[in-house]
């Protein structure tokens, strides 16, 4: 039986839809085509263990998987979940009625737990652009993806939840986040604030000019003069992000895997203060 499941490939800070076609027929071999990398090819062993650990049976048949578009390299273990769902659906263990409505992404552990992925936000944006009803992703990434409006984002912890949801046995509650409220909630919250600095008026003025105009600044002085202390606080006087800039910043952190667990929209301007040593 031929089925189609939908995932996404991240390129840069954007995503594109990947169609995963799975066909089960008589035989005993497993084939995967469509330019998968080593991590994607290794998904077979993870899927077998995850499926059978949760009481399902991996098909003892010839399984052919095609990931299109075939000219785009598919990288990482985030395709484990859509591959597993496609294989079980092709073996008639999962109903196919909902498969065209949802995009799925997630890495599987051997016990069927669904592990975090990179690029959840650009994947969610692409899912909405392509008209999908919802996105099923790891629970650790759900707040990050839920900043996308007009898309049902479901966070799951185990492959059994996904199977039962697609079979209509349980209902999952989508995570809803007020994007603007989330943006303004952390808008002016800083662990280190420039107002903590007492004195040093001329240096503070130089910092303000540099921050407002986007200029470089170099600090020279003896140890203990306050150089590092002031440099750490410059982020609190940098121009605030717009909502669009916040989305772009969050996409970059998402793709790089730098999002903290449970975080959503990054509303503070990125800042790095490397030590001269």
Predicted regions, residues:
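Conserved ASCE/P-loop NTPase catalytic core
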Residues: 205-277
């Amino acid at each position: 039986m031929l089925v189609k499941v939908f995932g996404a490939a991240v390129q840069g800070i954007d995503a594109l839809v990947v169609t995963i076609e799975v066909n089960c027929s008589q035989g005993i071999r497993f084939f995967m085509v469509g330019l998968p990398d080593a991590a994607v090819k290794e998904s077979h062993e993870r899927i077998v263990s995850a499926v059978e650990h949760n009481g399902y049976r991996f098909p003892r048949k010839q399984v052919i998987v095609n990931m299109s578009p075939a000219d785009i390299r598919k990288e990482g273990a985030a395709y484990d979940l859509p591959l597993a769902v496609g294989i079980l659906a092709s073996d008639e263990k999962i109903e196919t009625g909902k498969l065209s409505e949802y995009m799925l992404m997630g890495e599987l552990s051997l016990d069927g737990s669904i592990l975090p992925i990179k690029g959840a936000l650009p994947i969610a944006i692409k899912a909405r652009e392509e008209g999908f009803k919802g996105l099923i992703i790891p629970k650790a990434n759900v707040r990050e993806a839920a900043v996308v409006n007009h898309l049902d984002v479901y966070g799951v912890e185990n492959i059994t939840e996904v199977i039962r949801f697609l079979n209509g046995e349980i209902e999952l509650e989508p995570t809803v986040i007020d994007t603007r409220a989330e943006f303004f909630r952390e808008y002016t919250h800083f662990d280190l604030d420039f107002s903590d600095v007492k004195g040093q008026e001329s240096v503070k003025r130089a910092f303000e000019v540099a921050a407002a105009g986007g200029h470089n600044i170099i600090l020279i002085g003896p140890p203990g003069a306050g150089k590092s202390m002031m440099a750490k606080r410059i982020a609190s006087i940098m121009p605030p992000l717009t909502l669009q800039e916040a989305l772009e910043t969050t996409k970059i952190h998402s793709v790089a895997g730098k999002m903290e667990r449970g975080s959503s929209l990054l509303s503070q301007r990125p800042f790095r203060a490397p030590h001269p040593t």
